[in-house]
Structure formats: C-alpha cells, structure tokens
C-alpha cells in the first residue's frame, strides 16, 4: 500500500486500474497496480480522442484487397480495409484502433464512413470500367454495433 499511493482516493483509482487490467487478461486473473497501467490508460484516452478527430477529419484511408479468380486472372471483388496513418504515431494497426472504436462507440461512425467511402469507390470503378467488363463487388466488414444502429 504505501508504495502504491499516498492517499485513499489515489489508492482506489490504482485499484480500479489493476481490476480493469485483470478483467482484460481474462477470467480468474489478478493484476497488481503498476505505474505503466496509468500510462497505458492515458495513451488509450489520447488514441480515442485522436480516432474521433480522424473519423471527422478524413484522416482514415481505405485500402482494397482484391479477390482474384484464379482461372481467369480477373479481379472479381475487393475487400475494403480501414487504415489509419496517424500524423504523429505513423500507421496505427487496426488491431489497436478497432477495439478502442468498439469500446467508445466510435465504431458506428467508423463503419458509416467506411461504407460511404467504399460505395463511392465502387461507383467510381463502375463508371471507369470498359464497356462489357464485369462489375467488381466491394465487401466491407462492419461491427455488430453498426447493424444495430
């Protein structure tokens, strides 16, 4: 106790951080408070704020992974993949920002943006295709939250 906090309020905040870290580690786990937990929390809060700004400010990008028909060599569809080139952190991996979006509720705005952007791109590809060429479908993975909202 004495090394973890100087007063009761701080001790309780630190205990909460340790409890959430234990929950994140899985059922039946425990964690002792470590100063790195506070830094990790502040980093997640900053990343959430930055993600909200990125969605509103057009910082996100969609990359497309093609699905190719091996028999013909033609692209039959493409999967839209959200990428985030953060201005100071560099490329933030989806495994890092998608859970934050889900926990914060930003996943609905993120999904809406991805659907709108993928539809715009699909329309552009459709207008640019050669006469008689087959259309290319576009797939977008969305969260269950997106469907409910």
Give, region by region, the residue ranges found by the protein language model.
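Short, basic/aromatic recognition patches
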Residues: 43-65
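Catalytic-site/binding-pocket detector for metal-dependent nucleotidyl cyclases
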Residues: 105-106
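Catalytic core regions of nucleotide second-messenger enzymes
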Residues: 4-7, 23, 90, 126-136
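A short, well-structured catalytic beta-strand-centered motif of the EAL phosphodiesterase domain
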Residues: 64-99, 118-119, 139, 143-145
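Residues at or immediately flanking beta-strands
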Residues: 29, 59-61, 135-139
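Short beta-strand edge/capping elements of PAS-family sensory modules
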Residues: 9-10, 28, 76-79, 93, ...
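Cyclic nucleotide signaling catalytic output domains
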Residues: 1-25, 31-46, 50, 96, ...
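Helix C-cap/alpha-to-beta connector motif
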Residues: 113-142
